[in-house]
């Protein structure tokens, strides 16, 4: 008689914004030299990993979330399994992803899902992979994945995957607005490459439009997203949304990562709610969330064992 599995593992996968994203150069290896400040948010997806079923399976409430090997969750599972010295097929497991973080938005939803899958599947499969090895697996999957294993406010350099924890930023309410189209990371960096190669000079000159509205603090006055100008050149609506957040009281507003989502930081929840209500409508979706400290991120993304 086959023994029925007694428990599953559930974990939240928070989103992020990039408070600053400087693209400094194209590296000899083809990647980009970056200097970015990641900031974790309370908005999150939820992953539930259940043993059993027919092979390794991904299911989601969002049809835009791939269910095959192209999903970073699948790649994370394979790397974890191999890192544990295992061979052959992945264990029969169903990973259910409840998506709340939109895709192709610059909010790191897929990368956060992968980071959470590494932790959840290590627990479910009971594989002997250390925290240090898990971090290395995260870096191999991408800078955003490595960040989500840390959380809070973090500086990323080189490819964005060499991480240095920073003092947590002043807590803020965050309004996220996504237009009814996405921007792929590959496209955003490709557009930056075109401009950089055409100038054959430092990219700093193209960054003047990256800063849309600075806060009253000196630190935030230096926040710039170098991907914003080339993306806005193709999608001017993104800049209009950034400017609208500023008009509605955001102390800082910008595109997050490679877009297409934009964010605004607010001190007061009521002000943030009013801005969200005014910007949500036909062709846009808006969310209200908040920044999280490193401790809050780890509490939010802790592993939970549930009976099945």
Language-model features: where?
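ATP-binding N-lobe of GHMP and related small-molecule kinases
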Residues: 1-105, 123, 127-132, 169, ...
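Solvent-exposed alpha-helices and their adjacent loops that cap or buttress functional pockets
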Residues: 2-3, 40, 139-140, 146-149, ...
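Solvent-exposed beta-strand sheet faces enriched in polar/charged residues
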Residues: 20, 50, 59-61, 96-98, ...
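Short, basic/glycine-rich phosphate-binding loops at helix/coil junctions
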Residues: 54-66, 117, 139, 213-224
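Glycine/serine-rich anion-binding loops at beta->alpha junctions
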Residues: 96-125, 143, 251-266
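Contiguous, small/hydrophobic- and glycine-enriched helical/loop subdomains that border
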Residues: 114, 118-158
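Conserved, helical-rich catalytic subdomain that frames metal- and/or nucleotide-binding sites
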Residues: 148-150, 155-252, 267-308
């Amino acid at each position: 008689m086959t023994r029925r599995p007694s428990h599953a593992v559930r974990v939240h996968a928070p989103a992020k914004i990039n408070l600053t994203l400087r693209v400094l150069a194209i590296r000899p290896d083809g990647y980009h030299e970056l200097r970015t400040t990641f900031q974790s948010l309370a908005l999150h997806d939820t992953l539930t990993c259940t043993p059993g079923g027919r092979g390794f399976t991904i299911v989601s409430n969002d049809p835009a979330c791939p269910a095959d090997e192209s999903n970073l969750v699948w790649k994370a599972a394979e790397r974890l399994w191999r890192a544990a010295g295992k061979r052959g097929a992945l264990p029969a497991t169903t990973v259910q992803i409840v998506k709340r973080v939109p895709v192709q938005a610059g909010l790191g939803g897929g990368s956060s899902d992968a980071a959470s899958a590494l932790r959840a599947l290590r627990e479910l499969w009971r594989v002997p992979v250390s925290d240090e090895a898990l971090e290395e697996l995260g870096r191999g999957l991408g800078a955003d994945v490595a960040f989500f294993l840390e959380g809070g406010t973090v500086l990323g350099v080189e490819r964005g995957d060499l991480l240095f924890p920073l003092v947590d930023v002043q807590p803020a309410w965050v309004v996220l607005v996504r237009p009814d189209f996405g921007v792929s990371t590959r496209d955003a960096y490709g557009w930056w490459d075109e401009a950089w190669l055409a100038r054959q000079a430092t990219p700093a000159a193209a960054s003047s439009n990256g800063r849309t509205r600075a806060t009253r603090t000196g630190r935030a006055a230096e926040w710039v997203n170098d991907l914003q100008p080339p993306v806005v050149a193709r999608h001017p609506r993104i800049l209009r949304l950034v400017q609208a957040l500023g008009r509605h009281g955001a102390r800082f507003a910008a595109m997050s990562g490679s877009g297409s989502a934009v964010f605004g930081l607010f001190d007061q929840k009521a002000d943030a709610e009013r801005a969200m209500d005014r910007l949500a409508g036909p062709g846009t979706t808006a969310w209200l969330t908040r920044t999280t400290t490193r401790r809050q991120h780890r509490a939010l993304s802790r592993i939970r064992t549930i009976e099945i």
